[in-house]
Curated annotation (Swiss-Prot):
Pfam families: WD40. WD repeats lie at residues 136-175, 287-326. It comes from Caenorhabditis briggsae. SMART domains: WD40. The keyword ATP-binding does not apply. Residues 445-526 form a coiled coil. Residues 435-464 are annotated as: Disordered. This is Pre-rRNA-processing protein pro-1.
Length: 532
């Protein structure tokens, strides 16, 4: 282990902003470690006793909080999940249809994407359900990458193709539809060895292959915007957050640097001699003597970490091209990535936010399980939870094909609505009655015509008073007997209404029982929280 140009005494007591996760494909203990990239001191390590002597495959953190990590076993269909916190002994494992060749998860840690041979799997970790399985390529998948906003997932395979899929289509509830990639690139003629994706809403895809070619793809333009050809097969790649520098590794241990800001507007095809140490256009870093398996750049683009097939890894300062740290593991470097400083690494007090369900299904299901997560912000409004319970019951009744409480209420109130419509029609008819006598003096009338008009006026007044009295009586009856429903259509209609009322009563009783169970459950949870 060597340190060059770093005064470790000045930074020994400070907390780093980011760490470096390193894993090697070895069955030996502590083959997965987390180090401080400034000093090279290990802050966390995984002994690997749960692997039972199997070689470590890939290591992937679940989400950005670093509460759990996923560890695959090399050449075995076993996947383990363990807690990072030293006091949390959580460990689960599951058996999958085959060995996992690539894995990634979203920022929340609720979704996991894994590739097994030619197929891409998507699991919901809050329930363990397998949401989708698609045949993504003609040959085995080699790499997976998820976009920064978790909206797109990209796959690369041995057939030389790169495909992009929308996450919303992979997690959709419609399991019968076929998911097709929204982007397809066939820019390589041999196997794709590495795949990296940039940050932002319009990311770019960087790939390298065994055909000596590195390609930079644009999603918005749906084309290859840069192609670099090397004199050696390319095995790994990396691009910084600002998209200004590209690093590509070869099978002989050379690392070539491409400064994108120095290229001209028409320079789309580059020729790189990675073995030439005196190359003035493309700087070559020489610190390895074996195949470069992993390359990664930190967040601010100042440090580059590289690992090779012999287990050697280096940390470089990009601006000066100086190697700050050199160390070795016991086997091939299989995982190398910069991560934020997780609170779980320090071993202090930590409250877990999420616990994955690692009973991963092997066949796609249709939402057979229900996941309820306990919120840290407790809402004490009882009416809010009553509404939530009622909405949940209505949704379950609707999905099962039964009649919901809202539909029953609508059916029960149908006679009252019908009566209200009749009354409204009568009121409109009464408003259209023409009252005579108000305009008696407008025109002279004589003889029998005048006497007849007086009689008509009296009849109209009596009719209007009678209608007003009937309307008042009807309103009074409706107010006094609002709970009573009377229908004159026959005994069958009355029986139907009584049945609906009985169903409403049963639903109200079940709702009260659920409210009582909910109250007891929250009292129990509150008591448990207070006791802790």
């Amino acid at each position: 282990m060597a340190y060059l140009g770093v005064d470790t005494s000045r930074i020994a007591g400070t907390q780093p902003l980011e760490m470096l996760l390193i894993s090697s494909s070895s069955p030996d203990p502590h083959s997965t470690i987390i180090i401080d990239p400034r000093t090279g001191v290990s802050s966390w390590s995984y002994k690997g006793g749960e692997l039972q002597g199997a070689s470590t495959g890939l290591v992937e953190p679940l989400g950005k909080d670093g509460e759990h990590i996923v560890v695959t076993t090399k050449d075995r269909p076993l996947v383990h999940v363990i807690a990072v916190h030293s006091k949390d002994r959580f460990h689960q494992k599951c058996v999958l249809p085959g060995p996992v060749s690539a894995i990634c998860s979203d920022r929340s840690g609720r979704f996991a994407f894994m590739s097994i041979k030619r197929q891409l799997y998507c699991w919901l970790l809050s329930t363990g359900e397998l949401l989708s399985v698609i045949d993504a390529h003609y040959q085995n998948i080699t790499k997976l990458a998820l976009s920064d906003d978790d909206s797109m997932v990209f796959t690369a395979s041995k057939d030389g193709a790169i495909h992009g899929y929308l996450v919303t289509e992979l997690v959709s509830a419609d399991r019968d539809s076929t998911v097709a990639p929204f982007r397809k690139w066939a820019s390589h003629t041999l196997a794709v060895s590495d795949l990296k994706i940039t940050h932002g809403s319009n990311p770019r895809i960087l790939t390298t292959g065994a055909d000596h070619i590195a390609c930079l793809h644009s999603i918005s333009m749906d084309s290859v915007i840069l192609k670099a050809s090397a004199d050696r097969p390319l095995t790994s790649c990396a691009i910084d957050s600002a998209e200004t520098r590209i690093f590509i590794g070869t099978e002989v241990g050379n690392i070539a640097q491409i400064n994108l800001f120095q290229l001209g507007a028409e320079e789309r095809d580059l020729l790189i001699q990675a073995g030439d140490e005196h190359n003035t256009k493309f700087r070559v870093l020489n610190g390895h003597s074996d195949e470069i398996t992993r390359l990664t750049i930190n967040t601010d683009g100042t440090l580059l970490a590289s690992g090779d097939a012999s287990g050697k890894y280096c940390i470089w300062e990009i601006s000066s091209h100086q190697c700050l740290k050199v160390s070795t593991m016991r086997s091939t470097i299989s995982t190398l990535r910069f991560i934020p400083f997780w609170p779980t690494i320090s071993g202090g007090e930590h409250t877990k936010k999420f616990r994955p369900v690692w009973d991963l299904r092997r066949e796609p299901t249709k939402c057979e399980r229900l996941a309820i997560e306990v919120s840290n912000e407790f809402n004490a409004d009882q009416k809010h939870w009553n509404d939530v319970i009622e909405d949940s019951i209505d949704q379950m009744l609707l999905e099962s094909g039964s009649t919901t409480s809202a539909q029953l209420q609508w059916q029960v109130e149908a006679p009252m609505r019908k009566q209200a419509e009749v009354e409204k029609a009568e009121a409109e008819a009464m408003a259209q009655v023409i009252t005579l006598g108000d305009d008696e003096d407008d025109a002279p009338e004589v003889g029998n015509q005048r006497r007849q008009n007086k009689k008509n006026n009296k009849k109209n007044r009596k009719l209007q008073k009678k209608l007003e009295a009937e309307q008042a009586l009807k309103n009074k009856v409706i107010e006094e007997e609002a709970e009573l429903i009377v229908i004159d259509d026959g005994e069958e209609s009355n029986k139907k209404i009584l049945d609906l009322q009985a169903s409403m009563t049963e639903l109200r009783e079940e709702n009260e029982k659920l409210k009582e169970i909910n109250r007891q459950m929250y009292e129990f949870v509150a008591a448990e929280i207070v006791d802790r």
